[in-house]
């Protein structure tokens, strides 16, 4: 009985439809990170809000009133811009439109790492790699029928068996042929996500600006972004680093052997991004990259509200 008396009661949040849910610092902190607030600061704010509620003896609070407290606390602790961004995300969530992020970039630029962190911060459960889509398509379409599909993005030029004009870059021609087949699968996944209302991140080298139909990329809730690593030495180091973290991947020598092709593909993707007005972000720091992407997503989603 003594334990029961000493146990602190949680705060219940009353929703508009009458349902209640317990106040959770973890859930609120995750939502605050969407506003571009750092992880540590988000948890600090969530803790301070809980302390405000419990110090006043509040055991139940309406969602609307709680949102006012959250807004004012963010404004006090971080600033009005972040507070306004949080309020915008609440409005977006009520719209119930799926958010789909298309994250492209050359091999080794950090797409998977950034996609995982974005998924965590935005509460997105579905992350699809375009390599997985390519693998499914390889199972269906034979090498004889689709030779480019059965090469890697940076070795697809080896499947060229007809002369090409000398002014063309065969590595890019091969990559384009390879990517355009995978884009068919990407669009199928995109369409399904939109119909079923699934928040999703699709990441991979096959996200090429200009290749995915405008009927998708013109939607405010479909957000294409390209990542790149500017320094070639830094790019090369990343292959050695990920070989340590993920030993099941190809041997690092495989990537280094075709490093020139990987860099050419990166330059091509950045040029395509410039042509089609797609944001291209230099991926140097995970924290800075994620914050920039969240800022881009927020600006784009303003069109929904």
Task: List PLM regions with ranges.
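Conserved nucleotide-sensing/catalytic segment adjacent to the nucleotide-binding pocket
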Residues: 139-198
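Glycine-rich phosphate-binding P-loop
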Residues: 101-122
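Short beta-strand-centered segment that lines the nucleotide-binding/catalytic pocket of NTP-utilizing
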Residues: 124-140
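Short, surface-exposed, low-complexity cationic segments
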Residues: 24-43
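NTP-dependent small-molecule kinase module
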Residues: 267-305
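Extreme N-terminal, non-catalytic leader segments
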Residues: 39-100
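Loop/turn-to-beta-strand initiation segments
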Residues: 125, 195-202, 221-223
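A glycine- and Lys/Arg-enriched "phosphate-lid" helix/loop adjacent to the NTP-binding pocket
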Residues: 220-265
């Amino acid at each position: 009985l003594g334990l029961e008396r000493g146990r602190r009661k949680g705060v219940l949040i009353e929703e508009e439809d009458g349902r209640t849910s317990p106040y959770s610092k973890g859930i609120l902190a995750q939502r605050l990170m969407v506003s571009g607030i750092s992880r540590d600061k988000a948890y600090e704010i969530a803790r301070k809000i809980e302390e405000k509620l419990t110090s006043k003896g509040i055991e139940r609070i309406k969602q609307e009133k709680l949102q006012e407290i959250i807004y004012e606390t963010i404004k006090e602790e971080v600033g009005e811009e972040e507070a306004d961004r949080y309020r915008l995300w609440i409005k977006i969530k009520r719209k119930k439109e799926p958010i789909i992020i298309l994250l492209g970039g050359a091999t080794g630029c950090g797409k998977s790492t950034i996609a995982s962190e974005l998924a965590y911060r935005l509460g997105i459960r579905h992350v699809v790699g375009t390599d997985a889509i390519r693998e499914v398509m390889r199972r269906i379409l034979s090498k004889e029928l689709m030779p480019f599909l059965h090469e890697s993005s940076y070795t697809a030029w080896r499947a060229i068996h007809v002369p090409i004009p000398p002014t063309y870059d065969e590595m890019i021609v091969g990559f384009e042929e390879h990517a355009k087949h995978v884009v068919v699968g990407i669009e199928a996944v995109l369409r399904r996500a939109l119909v079923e209302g699934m928040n999703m991140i699709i990441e991979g080298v096959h996200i090429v600006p200009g290749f995915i139909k405008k009927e998708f990329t013109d939607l405010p809730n479909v957000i294409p972004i390209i990542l790149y690593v500017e320094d070639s030495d830094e790019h090369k180091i990343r292959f050695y680093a990920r070989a340590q973290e993920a030993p099941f991947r190809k041997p690092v020598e495989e990537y280094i052997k075709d490093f020139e092709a990987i860099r050419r593909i990166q330059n091509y993707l950045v040029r395509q991004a410039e042509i089609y007005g797609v944001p291209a972000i230099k991926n140097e720091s995970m924290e800075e990259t994620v914050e920039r992407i969240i800022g881009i997503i927020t600006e784009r989603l303003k069109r929904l509200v």
